[in-house]
Every structure is written in structure tokens, then in C-alpha cells.
Amino acid sequence: MPASLIDGREISALRRNELKQRVQHHVGLGQRPPGLAVVLIGNDPASVIYVSNKRKACEEVGITSHSYDLPAETTQEKLIQLINELNQSDKIDGILIQLPLPKHINERTIIEHIKPEKDVDGFHPYNLGRLAQRNPFLRPCTPLGIMNLLHHYELNVKRKHAVVIGASNIVGRPMSLELLLAGATVTICHKFTQQLQKFVEIADFLIVATGKMDVIATDWLREHQVVIDVGMHRLPDGSIRGDIDFKKAVEKVAWITPVPGGVGPMTIVTLLENTMMSAARLRE
């Protein structure tokens, strides 16, 4: 029997509608619309598409998107100067720096210059530290979006074994913290993990964020599993797929996210929700 689909498009649409009403209520109280600064350095095609989608999503819910498109040769000093200005601006509630950055700019340095209360990506060490200490505020968008998906479908991770494949600062590590916060027993696998198959086979929840296709063989999967595929790869024919072979996996597991249409839409709506949360807090 094919797996049940975890539909990120449907759930993100519901959450966007709820958020739109919250923004309208916020403005109805005499506040300006929440403001999100979206900073793009260079013209990487994938980044341009991602930024365009985020700006469009802002418009749909009533958040004001402030665009800062900088040339690829922008210096680190110039970027920090812009961030400092955005930190001080009373029109900006959230700051998003589109990653990856050009090689001459230090990603960690840039993230640490963003005010934690405007760090709507949730990457600042302060915000990650709060998550680790079980007192989160602004949380990384993809992991939180995944947790919201699981919650909607009543897929409870408490007392279950969750295996995270990938240990990036953006997904893998904060994902493990979210799962731990929710009461799961968590195993993190990475490029140095031995006997990866063994960990995959014993997972109740499998979150795959390797950035590579087919690291996880389909015959490792089990019929009771919930599989969350964070990967996104564009194939030569223009189609998009995830880290896992969806067509095979959907016939083996209990629940699975499609790619596209699974995790991606939830990441964007969570970014908008973080921006609204930041705006509300900055008004307190």
C-alpha cells in the first residue's frame, strides 16, 4: 500500500491564510506591516529564484519586503555596514541574508552581526543556544516547519526514535534539537557515520538532509517509517527530486514528504511567521 503523503503545500497554504489574518489584525491596531529585509549578494540562479519566492510570499500575507540586491563583488565590510543599518532601522523586523554567500565573505561573521531579535532565519548562535536550552524564540525555519508538518498530521515523535541524516548548521543540527525538545530519542548520522544502513533501518522517523541523491538506499526503508526528505535537486530534464528516490520509497514506508511540495513550502511560511513574531515582540 502506498505511503500517505505529508503535503507541505496544503499545510503552508492554511498557515499563510492564518498569518495573513494576524498581519491584518496587527495593522488594524495601528501598527505598520511587519518588515522583512531580504539581502541577495550576486546572481546565483537558484538564490535568485528562492529570493523571488520569499518576496512574493511576503506580499501575499501583507508583510513588507525590503529588497537589497548587491553585486557579487560586495565586500564583507560593506555587507556588515548594511546589516548594521538594518539592525537600527525601525522599519525592519527581520533580516534575511540569502545563503550561500560568495567565498570571500565569512558566513558565520555575517550571521553573528545580525541582531538576534531580527534573525528570522534562526541561525544566530544566541537563537540556536536558546533552542538548545529548551527556551526557543526565533527558530531555524526548515526544522520548525518540519515539526509543524508532523504536528498537523498528528505524527508524534515523543518516545520514538528519530534519525537525522546530515549535520549541517541549517538543518541537521537544529533539527536534532527540535526533535529532542519534542521528546524523541535522536540519532544524528553524517559523513563519518559507519554502518549507516543499520541506523536507517531502526528509525521510526527519518529526516534526510544529505544534499546528495541516493545516499539512502530504498531497500533500507521499513513499512512503519515516517520519511521527511529535505533535499532538492534539479535534474537535466528540468524535473526536481529529493535526496531519496520518491517513486520507490512511497511504496515502502508509512508516511513521506514529496519533493517538491513537502518541506520547501513550510520553510517559507515559517520564515514569514518568524517575521510576524519578531514584529510583535519589537512592539512590546
Swiss-Prot record:
<keyword id="KW-0028">Amino-acid biosynthesis</keyword>
<dbReference type="GO" id="GO:0004477">
    <property type="term" value="F:methenyltetrahydrofolate cyclohydrolase activity"/>
</dbReference>
<comment type="pathway">
    <text>One-carbon metabolism; tetrahydrofolate interconversion.</text>
</comment>
<keyword id="KW-0658">Purine biosynthesis</keyword>
<comment type="similarity">
    <text>Belongs to the tetrahydrofolate dehydrogenase/cyclohydrolase family.</text>
</comment>
<dbReference type="InterPro" id="IPR046346">
    <property type="entry name" value="Aminoacid_DH-like_N_sf"/>
</dbReference>
<dbReference type="GO" id="GO:0035999">
    <property type="term" value="P:tetrahydrofolate interconversion"/>
</dbReference>
<dbReference type="GO" id="GO:0000105">
    <property type="term" value="P:L-histidine biosynthetic process"/>
</dbReference>
<keyword id="KW-0486">Methionine biosynthesis</keyword>
<keyword id="KW-0554">One-carbon metabolism</keyword>
<dbReference type="GO" id="GO:0006164">
    <property type="term" value="P:purine nucleotide biosynthetic process"/>
</dbReference>
<dbReference type="InterPro" id="IPR020631">
    <property type="entry name" value="THF_DH/CycHdrlase_NAD-bd_dom"/>
</dbReference>
<comment type="function">
    <text>Catalyzes the oxidation of 5,10-methylenetetrahydrofolate to 5,10-methenyltetrahydrofolate and then the hydrolysis of 5,10-methenyltetrahydrofolate to 10-formyltetrahydrofolate.</text>
</comment>
<keyword id="KW-0511">Multifunctional enzyme</keyword>
<feature type="binding site">
    <location>
        <begin position="166"/>
        <end position="168"/>
    </location>
    <ligand>
        <name>NADP(+)</name>
    </ligand>
</feature>
<dbReference type="InterPro" id="IPR020630">
    <property type="entry name" value="THF_DH/CycHdrlase_cat_dom"/>
</dbReference>
<dbReference type="GO" id="GO:0004488">
    <property type="term" value="F:methylenetetrahydrofolate dehydrogenase (NADP+) activity"/>
</dbReference>
<comment type="subunit">
    <text>Homodimer.</text>
</comment>
<keyword id="KW-0521">NADP</keyword>
<dbReference type="InterPro" id="IPR036291">
    <property type="entry name" value="NAD(P)-bd_dom_sf"/>
</dbReference>
<keyword id="KW-0560">Oxidoreductase</keyword>
<keyword id="KW-0368">Histidine biosynthesis</keyword>
<dbReference type="InterPro" id="IPR000672">
    <property type="entry name" value="THF_DH/CycHdrlase"/>
</dbReference>
<dbReference type="GO" id="GO:0009086">
    <property type="term" value="P:methionine biosynthetic process"/>
</dbReference>
<keyword id="KW-0378">Hydrolase</keyword>
<dbReference type="Pfam" id="PF00763">
    <property type="entry name" value="THF_DHG_CYH"/>
</dbReference>
<dbReference type="Pfam" id="PF02882">
    <property type="entry name" value="THF_DHG_CYH_C"/>
</dbReference>
<protein>
    <recommendedName>
        <fullName>Bifunctional protein FolD</fullName>
        <ecNumber>1.5.1.5</ecNumber>
        <ecNumber>3.5.4.9</ecNumber>
    </recommendedName>
</protein>
<dbReference type="InterPro" id="IPR020867">
    <property type="entry name" value="THF_DH/CycHdrlase_CS"/>
</dbReference>
<dbReference type="GO" id="GO:0005829">
    <property type="term" value="C:cytosol"/>
</dbReference>
